[in-house]
Structure formats: C-alpha cells, structure tokens
Amino acid sequence: MKKLLFLLTTILLVSSTNVMAQQEQNDKKAIKEAKKAAKRAEKLLVFTEASQAMNDRKFLYKIDRVQINNGRFTPTDNRSSFFELNDTVTASQIDTGSTYSTPKLVYGSISDFESSTDKKGNLIVKFVLKEKTSIYPQEVTMKLEYESNECAMTIAEKKGKRTYIRGTIVPLGSEVIFRGTPVIY
C-alpha cells in the first residue's frame, strides 16, 4: 500500500511539473509570436510611410552607399548625402567623406514620373532627372523594398554609364540634413 501511495504521489508530482513546463513553454511561444507581429507591423508602417512619400513626390532619400567606377560600393555620410524630391524640384548632394572635396548641392527637376508595384510588393518609381549642371537628362529608377524603407536607385546616363546607390527613404521634413554650397552655373 505504501509503495502504491508513493508511486501515485510521484506520478502526480511529475505530471504537474510537466504541465507547468508545457504552460511556460507555451507562454514563451506566445511572447515570441507577439514580438514578431509587432516587428512586422512596425516594418509595414515604415514601408507605408515611405511609399506614400514617394507617391506624393515629397521624400528625402538618405544615401548610405554609392557604387564607384570600379564596381565597389563606397560608404557615404548619410547626414550630408541625399536626394530630395519636392513635387518636381530636386536637390542632390553626395559626400564621400574625402578630405579633397566638399559636398556640392545640385538642383534639378523631374518629368515623366511613373509609379508601379511588382509581384513581391516592392514599389518601383521611374522618372527623368534634369540637373542644372548637366546637359543630358538621366533616367532614374528607384525600387523601395517591401516592408522596409530601404531603397535602391539606378541612374542611367545617356552615354550608357550607370550609377547604383543604396539608401533609405523618409518623408520630407522628418530628418535634418546638412546642405553644402549650391552649384551655380
């Protein structure tokens, strides 16, 4: 009888411990799923703000990296490297951090603005850029990645040269940037 009572008590303790461990594991899973859902909602909010700013033509593209002539990307200072679009007026400046050059601010205008979405949900914007310092217009393609404000920009010049730029999109007026000396021609 004592053995039976001892066996039942042991089984009861082990089963209650297993139930508590299972409940604790389920709580951890629920917390992990809630964190994932919150992170996904935050990413979607950032993407929605960036895509709305691009469609409204009022955005600031903070440049992180620029592809230089030999094909490698070089980092830039994203507080002073940017492309700004306000309706049809643009301002652009790239600061590679070189001690030999200071950032120059270049103004321009755009035309033929087109916006579309691909199969993955990425926003693709195309337009023609005419800067005041260049006689040739440049075709610009911007691809905003879904659920992010990360954007890839490709600038195609008339002579066939392409420049690839990576950065982030933020609504105009939400970030403070350094503006260099305007280039006047």
What are these regions (language model features)?
Residues 53-64, 176, 181-184:
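Surface-exposed, interaction-prone regions used to assemble/regulate multi-protein complexes
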Residues 1-27:
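Bacterial Sec-dependent N-terminal signal peptides
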